[in-house]
Amino acid sequence: DGPDADFSFCDAYAPLDFGALRACEARVWAFFRTVADDMDRYADYAMGHNAANRMPLWVMPREKVSPKTIFDCMRDHYEGTPMDMTADIGAGGSACPYRWRPMEFEVDGVSYVNERATATQQTGFWFVAQARPWNPADMGILWFGVDDAATSCLTPIYCSAQEVPACLSEQNGSMLE
């Protein structure tokens, strides 16, 4: 009971703790900082150190966001940030951005955390929907990729498609032969 203005969906259903900030909000921050100005002021929030420095629910992009920008955001490993997975000790000499689970672990009584980037080797598939208002509604495109977003190519599938493209058909190829 109380005024609607006092209700916080996030606080009621998904209270923020270190894990939620570092594994979920950090990925939102990575997107936001790519398209909007002044997002570095929320780095401590994204890293799970300052839950009170809450990010906005949405941002105004500094310019029109292209499909390629969204593709690049989906392929992100926090490059160029304090959480850059290609530059920490886990990256080794090859700057490998992949970490094996669990995300949190302990060595000699000290707790550590691996990042949970947007692009990850556990991805089954990913997609980006592109609406193009100057075309008829059925000419929208679903850009579809299989496996890790950082290393997979994208196949355009038009919204007007009536069948699964041959290259993605279950009848095309065999995993056992």
Language model region names:
Residues 1-177:
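C-terminus-biased signal that marks the final domain/tail of proteins
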